[in-house]
């Protein structure tokens, strides 16, 4: 049970360090933007990919 509390505290510390550090936040936002663009491209091609076929 004690290990569970320690891991929660570690997760809180990780979240705090990732969100409140400006350099890490900028990198995380770039990664999120890239992931969003990739997911959007996959959805677009799944929906309208047959229209691109020649």
Swiss-Prot record:
The chain crosses the membrane at residues 31-48. It is found in: Mitochondrion outer membrane. The keyword Transmembrane applies. Signal peptide: none annotated. It is a single-pass membrane protein. Expressed in roots, flowers, young cotyledons and leaves. Residues 2-30 are cytoplasmic. Keywords: Membrane, Mitochondrion, Mitochondrion outer membrane, Protein transport, Transmembrane, Transmembrane helix, Transport. GO terms for cellular component: mitochondrial outer membrane translocase complex; mitochondrion; plasma membrane. InterPro entries: TOM5_viridi (IPR034553). Its main location: mitochondrion. GO terms for biological process: protein transport. A component of the complex responsible for the recognition and translocation of cytosolically synthesized mitochondrial preproteins. PANTHER family: MITOCHONDRIAL IMPORT RECEPTOR SUBUNIT TOM5 HOMOLOG. Forms part of the receptor complex that consists of at least 6 different proteins (TOM5, TOM6, TOM7, TOM20, TOM22/TOM9 and TOM40). Belongs to the Tom5 family. This is Mitochondrial import receptor subunit TOM5 homolog. It comes from Arabidopsis thaliana (Mouse-ear cress). The gene is TOM5.
